[in-house]
Amino acid sequence: MTNIRKSHPLIKIINESFIDLPAPSNISAWWNFGSLLGVCLILQILTGLFLAMHYTSDTATAFSSVTHICRDVNYGWIIRYMHANGASMFFICLFMHIGRGMYYGSYTFSETWNIGILLLFAVMATAFMGYVLPWGQMSFWGATVITNLLSAIPYIGTNLVEWIWGGFSVDKATLTRFFAFHFILPFIIAALAAIHLLFLHETGSNNPSGLMSNSDKIPFHPYYTIKDILGLMFLILTLMLLVLFSPDLLGDPDNYTPANPLNTPPHIKPEWYFLFAYAILRSIPNKLGGVMALVLSILILAIVPLLHTSKQRSMMFRPLSQCLFWLLVADLLTLTWIGGQPVEHPFITIGQLASILYFSTILVLMPISGTIENRLLKW
């Protein structure tokens, strides 16, 4: 008799995805982040569900409902902080996952890569709308500033912004629809993640060498299930250290003040994981130009496969490209720091230089380095 996990229509899918899946024998810890992102998504959906049971999406009661969750609901404080800091862990894993894809040339799986970009946009949209829900000062002003950027779109901009707001300013209608979208988007993300996996399993995983590994595959279980559990332990440990010892470390103190349309905070800034894009937005004096740079800073990932000039897939044996990759990482950290600083000298200049370096590294320097490496190897 055939084993049930190989014959049952439903269990067979799970078996082929997580148990008998042939995986390269040499994939490193950088391949752990996919499973960690899945865990983060499940954690966010579960904690979010329990928060939604007590939250009210009304401008009059939203702030006090979050306070009520933290003070009166059984373990509400830990659910709230796990959800808030879980978003930070989600983005850390996301950035590591994308970095891994760029370093080892995983972007040559074009369908998987493009769905990954869609996932990134969906997660960013979800996180942005979630940040608005507590209805603190930074929630309100962040929503006002970021949605108002759409008014830079010629001809339809103003109408588009008012349509999104549901009125002439960020108000009750905006909060209600943001809550609705924030609730539904994670399920869309889960569906996209399943498609992401489907396309990945069509080609099989990449590996650090970037070479074909069909001749040397091992079953996913038990080798990589154990390895993923180790990564999961580190993730949970880091998250719980953050939640239990310094839950507000990554938040903004202004968000503990209820939203007030008549009082603007001194420095309006988004959560830390958007600061790099925010710095690029601010580095261009023109509003439309800034919005275009903001969108392109993420959308540029879509043309990374087209800019691959090297005859080697991975950067494992390409020292020049490795230097440029780590320059890009340092540049993104610089942009993140600049995004959190006030708009004054010398931060403006540093931000502009870092923005130029970001685009030129991806669009110009990396393709050139690939060509140079080909020449050096006489290919």
Curated annotation (Swiss-Prot):
GO terms for biological process: mitochondrial electron transport, ubiquinol to cytochrome c. Its cofactor is heme b. Its main location: mitochondrion. The chain crosses the membrane at residues 33-53, 77-98, 113-133, 178-198, 226-246, 288-308, 320-340, 347-367. One of its GO terms (cellular component) is respiratory chain complex III. Heme b b562 binds at residues 83, 182. Binds 2 heme b groups non-covalently. Keywords: Electron transport, Heme, Iron, Membrane, Metal-binding, Mitochondrion, Mitochondrion inner membrane, Respiratory chain, Transmembrane, Transmembrane helix, Transport, Ubiquinone. PROSITE patterns: CYTB_CTER (PS51003), CYTB_NTER (PS51002). It is found in: Mitochondrion inner membrane. It is a multi-pass membrane protein. GO terms for molecular function: metal ion binding; ubiquinol-cytochrome-c reductase activity. It holds the Pfam family Cytochrome_B. CDD domains: cytochrome_b_C, Cytochrome_b_N. A ubiquinone binds at residue 201. InterPro entries: Cyt_b/b6_C, Cyt_b/b6_C_sf, Cyt_b/b6_N, Cytb/b6-like_sf, Cytochrome_b, Cytochrome_b_C_euk/bac, Cytochrome_b_N_euk/bac, Di-haem_cyt_TM. Heme b b566 binds at residues 97, 196. The cytochrome bc1 complex contains 11 subunits: 3 respiratory subunits (MT-CYB, CYC1 and UQCRFS1), 2 core proteins (UQCRC1 and UQCRC2) and 6 low-molecular weight proteins (UQCRH/QCR6, UQCRB/QCR7, UQCRQ/QCR8, UQCR10/QCR9, UQCR11/QCR10 and a cleavage product of UQCRFS1). This cytochrome bc1 complex then forms a dimer. Belongs to the cytochrome b family. PANTHER family: CYTOCHROME B (PTHR19271:SF16). Heme 1 (or BL or b562) is low-potential and absorbs at about 562 nm, and heme 2 (or BH or b566) is high-potential and absorbs at about 566 nm. Component of the ubiquinol-cytochrome c reductase complex (complex III or cytochrome b-c1 complex) that is part of the mitochondrial respiratory chain. The b-c1 complex mediates electron transfer from ubiquinol to cytochrome c. Contributes to the generation of a proton gradient across the mitochondrial membrane that is then used for ATP synthesis. This is Cytochrome b. The lineage of its organism: Eukaryota, Metazoa, Chordata, Craniata, Vertebrata.
